[in-house]
């Protein structure tokens, strides 16, 4: 059996919206706007947002100028997904396999917990070759079927969602901040003290038992 997927990695141009933002700008990408393709991309983003709200982590890997691409999230009101929905991103001209390797390391996830969604067949094949355990679905030519394709995967474990799952994007971002702050400390112990981490010990109860089971399963995986 395949492992439940925890991370959905997404391309941007012709995946989250129609058109190439570097050529048309954030105002003219095809998203919403009472156009059948724009509505299809919006539906797809809605489905992704639902997964995110159930604890699935989102990331972006896109060959674009970062500043230009991020304008869509900041300025285009038709966008369903916002920047704070994503745990991390790599928007550059680097090899996508290299970018995915960095993201998996950054989020401390194994490749078999990842789904890679990209409209470009060459990019999909590149990831398949480099990461055999990453799930890389074949995308239909018509974006209006993207939502259906994502639903068909049925690989995301969203049946039993804990409070920790819902806050995972925040946890990842907090962890990245801590790693950056670590560079300012010579002593590892001083860095740990600066974090002011508190540990609460609880008995197993109805509120935390689902999380306890998750941790047991993670320990067994190790």
Segment roles from a protein language model:
Residues 134-141:
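Short hydrophobic/aromatic-enriched beta-strand-loop microsegments
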Residues 43-74, 89-91, 199, 203, ...:
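Substrate-recognition element of Asp-dependent hydrolases with the DxDx(T/V) motif
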Residues 16-43:
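Active-site neighborhood of HAD-like aspartate-dependent phosphohydrolases
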Residues 28-36, 76-95, 102:
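Glycine-rich phosphate-binding "P-loop"
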Residues 5-21, 127:
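Asp-based phosphoryl-transfer active-site loop
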Residues 178-205:
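Conserved N-terminal entry element of GNAT/NAT acetyltransferase domains
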Residues 100-121, 127:
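Conserved Lys-Pro-Asp/Glu-containing loop-to-beta segment of HAD-superfamily phosphomonoesterases
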Residues 215-222:
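Helix-loop element at the rim of GNAT/NAT acetyltransferase active sites that forms part
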